[in-house]
């Protein structure tokens, strides 16, 4: 699985890798977001046993590296924490025109399974309880 690391929160890349490795039983390549590239060597040390056994690789680069990896035949699924714009570029195509055309036709450029958290859209559950007005 390709894990495209987040740029907004440093810890998310590690969480995403651990989830893919242990919850989904995937071998992973983590492409660090350039904003958090400084964290790559630290994750490399923390995950050294996984890297040594071939379960994880950490790579660096910009959008062109991410696009190349997303299209690589050895990558069978993708996880992204990022923007809707990046998701659309990976799944539907590079330009807004290509994306509109492909969305209308229902023909994604990339047909690999993609999981994504885009724009910090997280579920919130409200459980009835004895809350004060302030709570």
Question: Which positions does each model-derived feature cover?
Answer:
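Conserved NAD(P)+-binding/catalytic subdomain of aldehyde/semialdehyde dehydrogenases
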Residues: 49-135
């Amino acid at each position: 699985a390709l894990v495209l690391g987040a740029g907004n929160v440093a810890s998310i890349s590690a969480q995403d890798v651990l989830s893919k490795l242990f919850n989904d039983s995937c071998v992973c390549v983590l492409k660090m977001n350039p904003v958090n590239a400084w964290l790559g060597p630290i994750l490399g040390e923390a995950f050294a046993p996984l890297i040594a056994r071939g379960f994880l690789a950490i790579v660096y680069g910009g959008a062109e590296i991410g696009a190349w990896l997303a299209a690589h035949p050895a990558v069978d699924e993708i996880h992204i924490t990022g923007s809707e714009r990046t998701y659309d570029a990976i799944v539907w195509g590079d330009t807004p025109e290509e994306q509109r055309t492909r969305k209308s036709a229902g023909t994604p450029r990339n047909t690999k399974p993609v999981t994504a958290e885009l724009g910090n859209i997280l579920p919130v559950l409200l459980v009835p309880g004895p809350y004060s007005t302030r709570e």
